[in-house]
Amino acid sequence: MTWMVKLLRQMISMQSQYGAALGATCLLHYLTTSLSIRFFFHDLTVRKHEVMPLGMDYYYLYAIGKDPSHPEIRGSVRKILEKYKTKADKANCALALEAISEHARSVYEYFGFKTYLVFQFGVGEVNSKGEPDPQGKGFTAYLMLYHKDADTIFHA
């Protein structure tokens, strides 16, 4: 089983067992023990700091998701994003996240996020749908940032 499949299974398991907050914390631990640590916690951080002004604080929104077995529950992503956008606007700080699909990217764009890095994820482990494939090309992911004054203070 590849690390990506393990990661996705771990995320579903932890979120259904313990709720999203603890699930995300457990996922963070799992992710830091995988081979992707350099990319997620170094390369993406470097790009965030290239875009944002030196010393700018930011909230990192990690593992936002929805349980597909409950399509009747709507608006949870909106509540999370609106709450953190309000906090960030008041504190004059940014929001950062990674979108792992075109759909997620379009949702975040609707809420004012912009893409600052496009990258391939899971190459040689999964196909474009995230299914295990040792010859897989992985899938495209996006580093996205939000700030109320992004157009004037962020460096593209």
Swiss-Prot record:
This is Putative increased recombination centers protein 11. It is found in: Membrane. The chain crosses the membrane at residues 20-42. It is a single-pass membrane protein. Disruption phenotype: Displays increased levels of spontaneous RAD52 foci in proliferating diploid cells. Keywords: Membrane, Transmembrane, Transmembrane helix. GO terms for cellular component: membrane. Partially overlaps YOR012W. Disruption phenotypes caused by deletion of this gene may also be a result of a defect in its overlapping gene. GO terms for biological process: mitotic recombination. It comes from Saccharomyces cerevisiae (strain ATCC 204508 / S288c) (Baker's yeast). The lineage of its organism: Eukaryota, Fungi, Dikarya, Ascomycota, Saccharomycotina. The keyword Transferase does not apply.
